[in-house]
Amino acid sequence: MTTTATSPTLTEIQITPELGGLLAVPQGDGPWPAVVMVHEVFGIDENMRAQITRLSQAGYVVLMPNLYSRGGARKCLTATFKALAAGTGQAFEDIEVAKALLTARPDVTDKVGVIGFCMGGGFALLLANKGYDAATSNYGMLPKDLDEALSGACPILGNYGGNDGQLKDAKVKLDATLTKLEVAHDIKMYPNSGHAFMNPKQGGGPIFGSLLKITGAKPNPADAADAWTRIESFFGEHLA
């Protein structure tokens, strides 16, 4: 069981000279479990700062590497998605470096989890068998070869929206594969939500935000609250 904390300290750090990140540390005495957070497609914006704050308040030291550090979203977005599709590349190297820095801190325990949103949720699934104790994917893209990608994975929690386009079948596919692979899991589909339903505010800025809203990708506070309750319970069980 993790220790509930309030008002975590958020600090922008340099993980390496080329890689920045956002670190959240709870107030009070540690040590705390560690969690690597992988941001959504729009980078470390106001929504992602709210998500890292929320998780750290539950008693976790959380580090979110900025996968767009080497030139911003315009330059890095394509390369990051190529890495996600291939399951290898600079983005995975950056996440691994962030994990190493995080787990070497004296104020963390020997437990480490990974959580991702949107694009980051896809990374979280692919990282589930890479030395983590628990993984949470929030509306993350599914790997092409689920059996290969999730073999030997740690326990996985998933939160998906029933109105989320190509991810409508995510629960069915993940449940079937993870059950076959005997991986502990808890996947939930929220029938009244679309993509990015856990964001506190509409993402994408004035232009993309309006387009996303039309597609059903918009906040759903009630479902988001339930998803966070599930996340805190899940990490509380597996990262204690």
Task: Give the label of every model feature segment.
Residues 157-160, 190:
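Short beta-strand/loop motif that positions the catalytic acidic residue
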Residues 4-107, 200-217:
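Serine-hydrolase catalytic machinery in alpha/beta-hydrolase-like enzymes
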Residues 162-168, 195-196:
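Acidic catalytic loop of the alpha/beta-hydrolase fold
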Residues 51, 168-178:
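Short alpha-helix in the alpha/beta-hydrolase fold that links the catalytic acid
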Residues 96-153:
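Primarily recognizes the serine-hydrolase "nucleophile elbow" in alpha/beta-hydrolase
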Residues 60, 67, 140, 190-192:
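Active-site loop/turn elements of alpha/beta-hydrolase fold enzymes
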Residues 184-240:
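C-terminal catalytic histidine-bearing segment of alpha/beta-hydrolase fold enzymes
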Residues 143-153, 164, 220, 229, ...:
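Conserved serine/cysteine hydrolase catalytic core
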